[in-house]
Amino acid sequence: MYGIPDRLKPLSAAEEQVLLALWDCKPPASRRDIGARLAAKGWAAATVLNFLYRLEEKGWVICTKEQNRNLYSPTVTRRAYGVFTMRQRLDTVFGGDLAQAVRALVSESGCSQS
């Protein structure tokens, strides 16, 4: 659906943050690299590792071994995920009506339509 395989399970907000950090790392990335991107959250290394494990179980991430460390890669692109999440919100909130969503965004944001 929208560039995202149907087999993928929904993400929690925290899992999404870890996936975003992974994309920012220019994958494949180690747990340490991903954790560094999430330092402001104050999560322990074990917490980041737990979220990576969940993402792997849900099919969003694959883990490969290189020497004695695990490297993580997303199974979908950031763009595909963005389209998928926007489409979900568009369908849920605006019944799939893009024009209605854009009108609401323009009127609520104070942007001009010109």
What are the residue ranges of the model-derived segments?
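Pre-recognition alpha-helix immediately N-terminal to the DNA-recognition helix
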Residues: 16-21, 33
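Short acidic, hydrophobic short linear motifs in intrinsically disordered regions
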Residues: 28-37
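Short helix-capping/hinge SLiMs at alpha-helix to coil transitions
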Residues: 9, 22-28, 41
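Short, cationic-aromatic polyanion-contact patches
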Residues: 10-14, 66-85
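Short helix-coil junctions and helix-kink-helix linkers
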Residues: 36-45
